[in-house]
A protein has these predicted regions:
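Extended ligand-binding regions for polar small-molecule ligands
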Residues: 26-29, 33-47, 119-158
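Ligand-binding cleft/hinge of the Venus flytrap
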Residues: 11-12, 48-69, 98-102
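Solvent-exposed, polar/charged alpha-helical surfaces in well-ordered, non-transmembrane soluble domains
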Residues: 20, 33, 50-54, 73, ...
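Beta->alpha turn/N-cap motifs
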Residues: 1-2, 25, 43-46, 71-72, ...
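Short helix-initiation/N-cap motifs at beta->coil->alpha
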Residues: 66-77, 115
Length: 168
């Protein structure tokens, strides 16, 4: 939804999405400011790439090098081999990679970005579906249906439902 709020009518957000930084477990990087002059890998054309290229967020330090790679798996290989100090990626991408390849990285507590995911409708859509969808998504969150669905696929499902403070 972020960056497109004025382009569509939105139902939701129904889930929170986090862009994060991950490091090797023994890294001395614990917060975003520790990335100053460090080397970081991202997948090209992703939110983390834009965050580190644009540096419009005052929390984002000047890196030594930003390495943009065409394939997601490569950023984790670069991290594991020590070619970079950290990676920027979608949190679930990091978690899934660790599961798939039985490896461990440490995700920094401070996220790069937290955004809401919603359902977009055309601005001129007047069928009332957007409002019905928004109401249904909220009911599903309140009655626990969303939690039951998310916990089938993601660890720590409750944090993905923390959408009230996103400001939409």
């Amino acid at each position: 939804m972020e960056g497109r709020l004025d382009d569509y009518r939105w139902a939701g957000p129904y889930i929170a999405s986090r862009q994060v930084v991950a490091v090797n477990e023994n890294s001395d990087i614990y917060k975003l400011s520790d990335l100053e002059e460090k080397n970081l890998a991202v997948q090209s054309t992703t939110k983390p790439e834009g965050i580190f290229l644009d540096r419009t967020d005052e929390r984002i330090p000047k890196l030594g090098n930003l390495i943009s790679l065409g394939h997601r798996e490569l950023i984790y290989t670069f991290l594991g081999k020590g070619y970079v100090d950290a990676v920027g990626a979608h949190e679930e991408s990091v978690v899934q990679y660790m599961k798939d390849y039985d490896t461990s990285f440490r995700i920094l507590e401070e996220p790069l970005m937290v955004v809401g995911i919603g359902v977009a409708f055309a601005k001129d859509d007047d069928r009332g579906i957007c409002e019905q969808m928004d109401q249904t998504l909220e009911e599903m969150r309140q009655d626990g249906t969303s939690l039951k669905i998310i916990e089938k696929y993601l660890d720590h499902p409750q944090k993905y439902l923390e959408v009230d403070d996103l400001g939409y």
